[in-house]
């Protein structure tokens, strides 16, 4: 049904629209000025006052509004009832309570925060803020007060009607606002639908008639032959006239083309129907024409010479592009070009006509434009084809992605995304610079080096899926050839796509497994896989290159060997531990010549030797298997080290101890001396049963070795060959019926004594620990290097038994009941031997330091030595006692106790308080014995002297000891008030070019003694007679220097002498200073 302008239907529609617009305008005026914006925008759809083409009839029809009818309708109907609101109503008491609580909180918060304001802020600002708060709170209470007063003035207290009225206003206002904003949104969304020049007449024609009324000039195009027939009062164009015009156009086009420069790609053309047809194979066919010779060529039609599937792909692009064209050409856009490929012909026509009109070489410029357009379109068609393959095709499982760059006119494709072998496949599609054609390039170095394997493809638009299949097939061939070159796989003669890998089923048999490559995903998979093969298939697919894949397959082979050995040992009663994982692999005989060990995943290790090539480094793998029997000691295992290569597999057997500490497995002991190496093919059930019966004795021997290692005692087990060939001393191996019942271990003396070197010069460096299982005895054999004082003294408390066949050899013996506590017996042996070590060392040191005829050992016990070394000390049987304090493991302390009658007893506090080596103590006692002997003589002489004449003058002598290096003798006369101090120091003196320790004797603090002092003559006499060491000017035979002091030298204000000279020099000084002052003055 169609309506015309000015019809009754059109006027009725306009009247209804006018009434609605007036009602909408009245409502918007009640809502305020803020809602007028959207209402004004609705006038954009009305008739334009400035449009000159708007007719008076149209304006009259648009302005007809029956206002009276609308007013009568509104007054006749009663107003509707207001909807009653019963929700969100709060009582007045609750409102007052909430407002009061809010006010108190605001005041309290202000008082708290006002204290922390800035100090330099004036008080007026604080008062103003407080006043503003008070006014705000007062306003809230006033609003509530006004509301209460107002409600009381309403009749019948029906103030709820006001609430319902307010709710109705808000709802109505919201509806109007929603309508206004919806109209505004419609205007904004219809921006592209507006004409540049508003033509309301034509718009109304299209709206009412469906098409504009264009002039036809009384002609109607038709193919009817009778030109005289009239159709709707219009004459038809004669057919003859049409044919003649076409012939004239053919001639005109021929002449015009003959005068133009035709590029080589456009040489294929023909002229018919008044047009010239240029055809470029596999690209396009364009039709051009002209009006006369003076007019340029113009566009008529264009066809793209692609296949049907590609054309259907491009149709989506051209349809989307055609929507952006001019509105007046929408009807033409829907037409087809004859090959079911919709194009944006109006846009192309405009561009092509502009090129033909403005270009100096129009046909060349036209070809360049269309050629680039076709290449771009073909590239986009390839992009659409990839989208189709990735979304719904065979590559829909995320095995292929591509990146389309329209600016660079390239497509980058990556396939085999889930596979990592030889990185991800890469393909680049773009325009080749030399040929300016669309090509596909396969970026693969191996394919570039290979012969008869293409990497560049042309004509890709119609065959993109086939090209991808060929590239993936060739890529799989390259990977297979690289793997076959490593001599790990074998090629299947029946199926060239299959790789065969040999896996052991038993120790002596192998079976092949088949490995293939999925051409779509690029992943490896096994045919008829087991759970183990499925697990390794995922590892193989994570391999970065052929080297890593070959190593993973070697790990698969090693795991299969482990499974075979584990099954064999478990079937014969052994238990295999699968939870033990050590940090470092067992160092085998394969990797003892400077090889490196590289840890891999799942506790596997790649072992690289110096003799292996780089390609074989990662193909030599090691795995350690820990097995044991149920009755074995705890933590002891038989360790099988399986070393697998491409062609063979060897197994090394060792005994070790593995302990779990803090959740980590630690290898505490490992036997590397008796390693058994066998090939995998030689392991049988019979040999495993024999191993069960012969390995227990080795376990016990290694337990003893481990106990010694825990004590950090270096040891070496003596093999049965050494015992049988009698390479050991005869007294060690005698007394045993068979060598199977004894174990002999060589121990190092220094490590047995925890690093002490005290007996290196006394005992032999090696000892022998002999365990007799039949008699349950353990002995420790040792031997003196030379005849010492200890050999002459038999000490029963040390439990030392000397060997009759060897006078210098002895042994310590204990009986045991449990080999698990053998450490306790070794501790006892160590304690006794340490006592012997210290005792022997002390005796040897005493004989060395006290080399005199007066030295004599009085008593010798395990923990005590008493000896005499002074010449004239006969008051006691001993001069010194050495006590050795021990604990359960070692020597705790060694103390030196001087006897009370010993002149050196004065230094006992220094020996007790200072921790000095007993070697130093012995040397010190010997060096200072003559000094203290002289001091004892001086003290005894002064203490036993009595003055019978009753003289009041007597000299007192005191001995002082500051430390072990400085002594003093004080001569003091209380009657005369004189005090003379002699200092004796131990000093290192350079004498005859070498350092030597001597006694330095000199006066101390002589500044207070003047020439008038009574003590000055005695000091002067000592300086001239003793310190000067010059007796010529003294002239008296008593002052001649003693012969024992011939080595004394002058040193500063005193004299330095040896221990042998200290006594005569001190006695000479004492003879001078012991005289009373009154006797010396007289």
From Swiss-Prot:
Residues 1-80, 319-343 are annotated as: Disordered. Residues 13-28 have a biased composition (Basic and acidic residues). Residues 321-340 have a biased composition (Low complexity). The modification N-acetylthreonine is found at residue 2. GO terms for biological process: negative regulation of transcription by RNA polymerase II; positive regulation of transcription by RNA polymerase II; positive regulation of transcription elongation by RNA polymerase II; positive regulation of transcription initiation by RNA polymerase II; regulation of transcription by RNA polymerase II; RNA polymerase II preinitiation complex assembly. GO terms for molecular function: RNA polymerase II-specific DNA-binding transcription factor binding; TFIIB-class transcription factor binding; transcription coregulator activity. Keywords: Acetylation, Activator, Nucleus, Phosphoprotein, Transcription, Transcription regulation. InterPro entries: Med14_N, Mediator_Med14. The modification Phosphothreonine is found at residue 1036. Residues 29-59 have a biased composition (Polar residues). One of its GO terms (cellular component) is mediator complex. It holds the Pfam family Med14. The modification Phosphoserine is found at residue 7. It comes from the Eukaryota. It is found in: Nucleus. PANTHER family: MEDIATOR COMPLEX SUBUNIT, MEDIATOR OF RNA POLYMERASE II TRANSCRIPTION SUBUNIT 14. Belongs to the Mediator complex subunit 14 family. Component of the Mediator complex, which is composed of at least 21 subunits that form three structurally distinct submodules. The Mediator head module contains MED6, MED8, MED11, SRB4/MED17, SRB5/MED18, ROX3/MED19, SRB2/MED20 and SRB6/MED22, the middle module contains MED1, MED4, NUT1/MED5, MED7, CSE2/MED9, NUT2/MED10, SRB7/MED21 and SOH1/MED31, and the tail module contains MED2, PGD1/MED3, RGR1/MED14, GAL11/MED15 and SIN4/MED16. The head and the middle modules interact directly with RNA polymerase II, whereas the elongated tail module interacts with gene-specific regulatory proteins. Component of the Mediator complex, a coactivator involved in the regulated transcription of nearly all RNA polymerase II-dependent genes. Mediator functions as a bridge to convey information from gene-specific regulatory proteins to the basal RNA polymerase II transcription machinery. The Mediator complex, having a compact conformation in its free form, is recruited to promoters by direct interactions with regulatory proteins and serves for the assembly of a functional preinitiation complex with RNA polymerase II and the general transcription factors. Present with 319 molecules/cell in log phase SD medium. This is Mediator of RNA polymerase II transcription subunit 14. It comes from Saccharomyces cerevisiae (strain ATCC 204508 / S288c).
